[in-house]
Amino acid sequence: MLMPKRVKRRKQFRGSMAGKAMRGNTISHGEYGIVAMESAWIKSNQIEAARIAMTRYIKRGGKVWIKIFPDKPVTTKPAETRMGSGKGSLEYWVAVVKPGRVMFEIAGVAEETAREALRLATHKLPVKCKIVSRADLEGGAGSEN
């Protein structure tokens, strides 16, 4: 699972997911990618499941880039616990994703293979996604999943 090696503070506020992604909204490494269409917290195990789905489909060929990193800690209190007595313990790590964010990229395989691998990965993620190519993002609209 992905998680930071060390953090300045163990527990964080929830924060806001308003607005669009200003950074990470272009395909920088690969030829095809998955773009988020809505805001969400994506857990580290969901990122890992999507990565495994892609790499198993493309087998030995190609390269996959993960463009998001779970750097936000999420805490929970035990079930049937009274309110108060401090913030809960750290449960898992999430990556905050906003609309327009490129989450995964893939290169080195045929277009049909890349699109199918990315389609399998989108089923592992809790957001609506769009599969795009480098030409789609430079030119205009992408293909809908």
Swiss-Prot record:
Gene3D superfamilies: Ribosomal protein L10e/L16. PROSITE patterns: RIBOSOMAL_L16_1, RIBOSOMAL_L16_2. GO terms for biological process: translation. It comes from the Bacteria. Keywords: Ribonucleoprotein, Ribosomal protein, RNA-binding, rRNA-binding, tRNA-binding. GO terms for cellular component: cytosolic large ribosomal subunit. Pfam families: Ribosomal_L16. GO terms for molecular function: rRNA binding; structural constituent of ribosome; tRNA binding. NCBIfam families: rplP_bact (TIGR01164). PANTHER family: 50S/60S RIBOSOMAL PROTEIN L16, LARGE RIBOSOMAL SUBUNIT PROTEIN UL16M. Belongs to the universal ribosomal protein uL16 family. Binds 23S rRNA and is also seen to make contacts with the A and possibly P site tRNAs. Part of the 50S ribosomal subunit. This is Large ribosomal subunit protein uL16. It comes from Lachnoclostridium phytofermentans (strain ATCC 700394 / DSM 18823 / ISDg).
